[in-house]
């Protein structure tokens, strides 16, 4: 589509520096830490600093210097508010850093590599066990051969498939055709609860 177009190659960082008048530099790793603290503190969310996509259009002067002057005249307190929120979180992180030693790191790595990897399998076991005990039946996980038939496990003699709720929203071309009874589950991120949905005829 652009085969016949002329290409112009610019050093964006250099051009940006010409407009802003400076290139802000930070010591190694510091921006990663500040970014993480900001994510936790939610310091630059719209409710703190304003909805940037709207404010930039409200500014009557459509230049960098005009925008900077306008925002600082109207919302300079929001910069301070965001700074305070992030700074407080940095202090919390500093305190947490004092608690981290090699043994804690080893436990974290083990949890990530072993437990988190097996979370899907663990969820299947929990779901099968919960529903089977409720019905007074035995349960088991599927064999590799049974898995190839979309079976994740058995409750009594009933084969079942276990899928996350997000599976339901997939397009039919992505979603597999499953003829057996399906159990759905939802595990919200950072929630301790697992929600199970089924209408099994067992």
Curated annotation (Swiss-Prot):
Keywords: Endonuclease, Hydrolase, Nuclease, Plasmid, Restriction system. It is an enzyme of class 3 (hydrolase). The keyword Nuclease applies. GO terms for biological process: DNA restriction-modification system. It catalyses: Endonucleolytic cleavage of DNA to give specific double-stranded fragments with terminal 5'-phosphates. One of its GO terms (molecular function) is type II site-specific deoxyribonuclease activity. InterPro entries: Restrct_endonuc_II_MjaI. The keyword Ligase does not apply. Disulfide bonds: none annotated. Its EC number is 3.1.21.4. Pfam families: RE_MjaI. This is Type II restriction enzyme MthZI. It comes from Methanothermobacter thermautotrophicus. The lineage of its organism: Archaea, Methanobacteriati, Methanobacteriota, Methanomada group, Methanobacteria. The gene is mthZIR.
């Amino acid at each position: 589509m652009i085969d016949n177009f002329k290409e112009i190659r610019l050093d964006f960082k250099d051009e940006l520096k010409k407009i802003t008048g400076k290139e802000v530099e930070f010591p190694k790793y510091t921006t990663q830490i500040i970014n993480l603290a900001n994510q936790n503190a939610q310091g630059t969310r719209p409710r703190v600093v304003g909805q940037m996509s709207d404010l930039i259009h409200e500014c009557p002067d459509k230049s960098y210097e005009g925008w900077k002057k306008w925002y600082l005249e109207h919302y300079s307190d929001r910069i301070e508010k965001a700074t305070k929120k992030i700074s407080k979180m940095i202090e919390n992180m500093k305190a947490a850093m004092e608690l981290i030693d090699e043994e804690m790191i080893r436990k974290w790595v083990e949890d990530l590599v072993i437990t988190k990897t097996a979370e899907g399998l663990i969820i299947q076991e929990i779901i099968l066990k919960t529903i089977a005990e409720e019905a007074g039946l035995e349960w088991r996980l599927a064999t590799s051969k049974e898995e190839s038939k979309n079976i994740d496990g058995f409750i009594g003699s009933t084969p079942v498939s276990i899928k996350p709720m997000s599976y339901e929203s997939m397009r039919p071309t992505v979603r597999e055709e499953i003829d057996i009874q399906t159990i759905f589950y939802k595990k919200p991120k950072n929630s301790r609860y697992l929600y199970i949905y089924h209408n099994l005829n067992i």
